[in-house]
From Swiss-Prot:
Subcellular location: Peroxisome
Renumbered residue ranges of the record's region PTS2-type peroxisomal targeting signal: 1-26
Source domain of life: Eukaryota
Tissue: Mainly expressed in liver and intestine.
Name by which UniProt lists this protein: 3-ketoacyl-CoA thiolase A, peroxisomal
Presequence positions on this chain: 1-26
Function: Responsible for the thiolytic cleavage of straight chain 3-keto fatty acyl-CoAs (3-oxoacyl-CoAs). Plays an important role in fatty acid peroxisomal beta-oxidation. Catalyzes the cleavage of short, medium, long, and very long straight chain 3-oxoacyl-CoAs.
InterPro entries noted in UniProt: Thiolase, Thiolase-like, Thiolase-like_sf_Thiolase, Thiolase_acyl_enz_int_AS, Thiolase_AS, Thiolase_C, Thiolase_CS, Thiolase_N
Organism listed in the record: Mus musculus
Length: 424
């Protein structure tokens, strides 16, 4: 109820004093390791391909998913039959990709005795898969499991909400669930005063950070090169290997961004340059109970400290992280100042800027390797991809630290998770 009052008060333009949204003095506390901790053992991802134009435009999602499932198991030398469960986030495939994901499991050599489910919480599906596997570990259903996300936006259609009752006309919030995502971005920009200049500044920074990270090889440890077949303009098959993200544009300039026309509304501020890219990709994260990881001699890349999902108004769904992040931090007993890296999905620059400003997050802590504006946003994959990128970057830095993964969710939600990197 308090959160609802805070959200409604902010939407009405009233000042609020919720301490959960304020950056408090640094109070980082690293808890003692517990045998029951849910730990991240390892994670890999495919490169992110440009939908309909990139190297994965003809690659089916089961092949993308199989690539990361196989790589994670091989990297840590885990026997596939030791998995207790697999959860796969997917948005666009029929039935959240339930059949596709089970096929990918078998293509990866994982036996039928290992169960699998899929989940669709839209843009947070990959992170929800992580939470689902963590929940199974915590409740004792199993000790080790795989959380994944996958999306082929090249091969799957968007925009059909399915069979909807005509009674949605009776509810404003129900109608708002059908607001096009681009229009929710325009709503955020207008309602909260996020200028075109701020959006383009944020987009340029994302491209520059991603280009720098790519040139320095920062993604090399997390990316699984994928050899696949692509059809050229003449319809001829060609075998290629995709080994790096395709959406990064090192030549991006403010002048170039400023020339782009509004994509969703005349006189609007959301453009193709300050929005996330339509993309293809997959990611997989291996989780375990700490005691099981130690028993099997598996590495520990991180510890899941908290997870939260919140609801916000559907027509400004992009503000979700501004409310999910404080909820996750509170569960972990932490503040904004305790976090070294915030991986906040850049669905649109408008909503990302709003969330960063609302929470008072220093710019240098936000998406240090770039985000979805530069890297791309394969819907079901993104949450799992962010976990892999976050923990690998914390590992590169070497010291014990906390990081946050968060994203907005279509129809009006936000999700966030807090991870601890244990230090080299």
């Amino acid at each position: 109820m308090h959160r609802l009052q805070v959200v409604l008060g902010h939407l009405a333009g009233r000042p609020e004093s919720s301490s959960a949204l304020q950056a408090a003095p640094c109070s980082a506390r690293f808890p003692q390791a517990s045998a029951s901790d849910v730990v991240v053992v390892h994670g890999r991802r495919t490169p992110i391909g440009r939908a309909s134009r990139g190297g994965f435009k003809n690659t089916t999602p089961d092949e993308l998913l199989s690539a990361v499932l196989t790589a994670v198991l091989q990297d840590v030398r885990l026997k596939p039959e030791q998995l207790g469960d697999i959860s796969v986030g997917n948005v666009l495939e029929p039935g959240a990709g339930a059949v596709m994901a089970r096929i990918a499991q078998f293509l990866s050599g994982i036996p039928e005795t290992v169960p699998l489910s899929t989940v669709n919480r839209q843009c947070s599906s990959g992170l929800q898969a992580v939470a689902n596997i963590a929940g199974g570990i915590r409740n004792g259903s199993y000790d080790i499991g795989m959380a994944c996300g996958v999306e082929s936006m090249s091969l799957s259609g968007m925009g059909n909400p399915g069979n909807i009752s005509s009674r949605l006309l009776e509810s404003e919030k129900a109608r708002d669930c059908l607001t096009p995502m681009g229009m929710t971005s325009e709503n955020v920009a207008e309602r909260f005063g996020i200028s075109r200049q701020k959006q383009d500044d944020f987009a340029l920074a994302s491209q520059q950070k991603a280009a720098s990270a790519q040139s320095r090889g920062c993604f090399r440890a997390e990316i699984v090169p994928v050899t696949t077949t692509v059809l050229d303009d003449k319809g001829d098959k060609k075998t290629i290997t995709v080994s790096q993200d395709e959406g990064v544009r090192p030549s991006t300039t403010m002048q170039g961004l400023a020339k782009l026309k509004p994509a969703f509304k005349d006189g609007g501020s959301t453009t193709a340059g300050n929005s996330s890219q339509v993309s293809d990709g997959a990611a997989a994260v291996l989780l375990a109970r700490r005691s099981k990881a130690e028993e099997l001699g598996l590495p520990i890349l991180g510890v899941l400290r908290s997870y939260a999902v919140v609801g916000v108004p559907p027509d400004v769904m992009g503000i979700g992280p501004a409310y999910a992040i404080p909820a996750a931090l509170q569960k972990a007993g932490l503040t904004v100042n305790d976090i070294d890296i915030f991986e906040i999905n850049e669905a649109f620059a408008s909503q990302a800027v709003y969330c960063v400003e609302k929470l008072g997050i220093p710019a240098e802590k936000v998406n240090p390797l770039g985000g979805a504006i530069a890297l791309g946003h394969p819907l079901g994959c993104t949450g799992a991809r962010q976990v892999v990128t976050l923990l690998n970057e914390l590992k590169r830095r070497g010291r014990r630290a906390y990081g946050v993964v968060s994203m907005c969710i279509g129809t009006g939600m936000g999700a966030a998770a807090v991870f601890e990197y244990p230090g080299n």
